[in-house]
Each structure stands twice: as C-alpha cells, then as structure tokens.
A protein has these predicted regions:
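Local sequence-structure signature of Cys/Sec-based thiol-disulfide redox active-site neighborhoods
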Residues: 1-28
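C-terminal alpha-helical interaction module
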Residues: 4-6, 43, 74
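Short alpha-helical
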Residues: 11, 37, 50, 63
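Non-catalytic interaction surface on structured domains
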Residues: 23-26, 44-45, 61, 70-71
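Thioredoxin-like thiol-disulfide oxidoreductase module
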Residues: 32-48, 76
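Structural micro-motif
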Residues: 46-56, 65-66
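Non-catalytic, surface beta->alpha helical segment in thiol-disulfide oxidoreductase systems
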Residues: 57-79
C-alpha cells in the first residue's frame, strides 16, 4: 500500500497519483496543503525531505515522483 503526501497545486503529485491509478495500485492520499502537522510528520519519516509528493510504500520512504517513476521503469512497483 502506498501513502502519498500531496498539495492541491503540485503537478508531480497529480502525475504520481495517475501512475499508481493506471497500474491499479492502491494508495492513500494525505493533502498537506494546509495541514502542516501532517507535512512535518511525513518530513520526519522521510529524513527531512520537504517537497511533495512524499511517497511511502509500506511505511518505507520511496522519494518523489521521479523516484516512483524509476521504480515503475524497473518493474518494481507491481508485486
């Protein structure tokens, strides 16, 4: 299961959600546009990462959209 921390104005957040949806992979989205507490919590889990999207898989931090896309190209997103 993926967890994506997003903002409503981020194009890479949209692309990450579209990629996971196109692969029929489930994800939970947490909009941190105005939720600074959730953003700070995610940033701590991600080792200080401050930009969105912040993408996690089974509580492990993946990175941003580029990192997610690299995993897709390597065939590592589908179980």
């Amino acid at each position: 299961m993926f967890k994506i921390y997003t903002t409503n104005y981020c194009p890479y957040c949209k692309r990450a959600k579209e990629l996971l949806t196109s692969l029929s992979l489930k994800f939970e989205e947490i909009d941190v546009t105005e939720n600074t507490e959730a953003r700070d919590e995610a940033s701590k889990k991600a080792g200080g990462w401050m930009t969105v999207p912040m993408i996690f898989r089974d509580e492990g931090f993946i990175g941003g959209f580029d990192d997610l896309y690299k995993l897709h190209l390597q065939g590592k997103l589908k179980h």
